[in-house]
């Protein structure tokens, strides 16, 4: 079943307070939120995504932006990869 995000634009506009900041999409899925975040941050900004689903992770590998990295892991393990103080915004 295809997930259609509700209030996508509004939620991302609220999330991004610094176009040069670092952001995390904790549930990549098919990348709807990630794609919009990447469109709204600058080339100096950075987006990381997490998804433990192998199909979602494989789909994320199609994102070729230099300011994007995906992790095949659960967001509950964020602290293995990041200090939360260094993140400007997180979306679940």
Spans of features found by a protein language model:
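SAM cofactor-binding core of SAM-dependent methyltransferases
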Residues: 6, 18-81, 88, 92
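S-adenosyl-L-methionine
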Residues: 1-18
């Amino acid at each position: 079943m295809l997930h259609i995000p509700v209030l996508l634009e509004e939620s991302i506009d609220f999330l991004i307070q610094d176009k040069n900041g670092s952001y995390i999409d904790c549930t990549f899925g098919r990348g709807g939120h990630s794609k919009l975040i990447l469109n709204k941050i600058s080339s100096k900004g950075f987006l990381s995504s997490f998804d433990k689903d192998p199909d979602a992770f494989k789909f994320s590998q199609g994102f070729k932006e230099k300011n994007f990295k995906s992790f095949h892991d659960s967001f509950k393990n964020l602290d293995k990869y990041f200090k939360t103080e260094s993140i400007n915004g997180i979306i679940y």
